[in-house]
Amino acid sequence: MSLQKHGLLFNNNKFSDCKLVLDDGNVQVTLNVHKCLLYMNSLYFQAMFDNFKEQEYSEIKIRVQNSQIATDVIKSFYEKSNVINADWQYQLDYAIETKFFGVEYVLDKNIIVPYIYFDLFVDKIELIGYNNTTLNMILNNLPLDYDLDKFPTDFLEGLLVSSTEYDIFLSNKHCFYVWSVTDNKFTYSKEIPLELYYSYLDNDKIYKFTEHNSLICFNKKTDRHKSILLYDNDKIIKFDTEGVIYYLPENNQIILSHVERTTTGCDYKISLFCLETKQLIRTFHSRNYFGNEIILQISVSHDKIIVFGDDVQVKNFSSGVCLFTINQNESGVCIACDPEWSYFAIGSEDYDTEDQKITIYDLSNGNKVKTLNHRDSIRDILWTSKYIIAHNNENIYFYETNNYELVKKLDYKNNGLIKKIDCFDDSEFLYVLTNNSKMFQINMDSLENTDSNNISTEICFTQIGRFCDFKTIKNSNYHKSKLIKKTLEQRRRMDKN
């Protein structure tokens, strides 16, 4: 029998064999119901009618949290309910009643709760029960200025485990996407009728060059984009679409590669611009020919920038003054800095060099610290607190940071050519993008591929096409996770003392 016909039985009071009284202490509701439908739809009533004397009763009284919402749960046995459009408090109260009656219900985890009701919200979640969904809901609604000392340690640890503080940004020449690691799905996509080149994303802002040498900023929150013109005094800057973009949110500044025509040809520059005034601040690097790719490593807090053109130069970010230079004539140079910005590593993709190597330098003075005997070419390097990670097209190499010894080599020949690797801060996973648009996940403890190692399904591949680039990015829970970690660290220090 359809739900529509069940509804006719209920609304017309046909063939009812039981009066059900729902009482929350303030309001009492009496319903004419059918035991067979209660039994079929509720584990609570199954247990009652199988094991207790109520199976013989014509009237049953039950104490509930909320009589009106409990009534809606019972009515859902007869006709379709529309809970998803209700306010946050109703949805939570409905979930509490479905749990009581043993009725399957999927809670909308995107519920938004007003700041002033957060404590009430947490109390209701406690009645529903803690799981990944409800803990995620709490983290999503947690105010940044909330007193975390109200929560016990195991609860805060549960909040961290239930969610990640990063997402994955992927792009190709006409589109870009955001993949939620927590939800295991794409949560944002944008298609653009222009051919897009190098991009940079910071939280909600995405900066990209287009085929028309213009810079576009996309805002994820508003789902809108705008073109940006930048100037050197009154002269409009022409961008190098094959170059680099590096956005500095703390200063609202952006570093770009651009082209300046001269009487002898062109100067290819890398410069800092203010997005407030749209004006050039300073130029870090200039060359008058298409040469080696310019590589950037930047830390505003450490006041350093590393650029590579004809050689590697370490400069003060604030002044542009060169601190020291390292001769590096090979092509395909890659650079990575340690998390504390005390050292940096230089590797090369040059196949003509007989003895491939990774060299570690001191960032304070440019002195050579260590040379790693690396026999294969290198496309890129990452430096985490635990490993220096290098890769070429087929292999990934893990060197320990405490002794610079090779501890693992992962062969990816059977998975496709490696395009890029990335790891968010010191997270437990390294992500690998291959040329067939497959994304693999490596556990940083075991240094093995995980079982869930491909986020790009065949359907996704058909709809989207090949990805050109990806990056792990902060998500909306990043700052909250940092505050929770800080609170837990303070408690551990207090426990030790």
From Swiss-Prot:
SUPFAM superfamilies reported in the protein's UniProt record: POZ domain, Quinoprotein alcohol dehydrogenase-like
Pfam families: BTB (PF00651)
InterPro entries attached to this UniProt entry: BTB/POZ_dom (IPR000210), Quinoprotein_ADH-like_sf (IPR011047), SKP1/BTB/POZ_sf (IPR011333), WD40/YVTN_repeat-like_dom_sf (IPR015943)
Occurrences of domain BTB (ranges): 16-86
Family of this protein: Belongs to the mimivirus BTB/WD family.
Protein name, per record: Putative BTB/POZ domain-containing protein R738
The species this protein was found in: Acanthamoeba polyphaga mimivirus
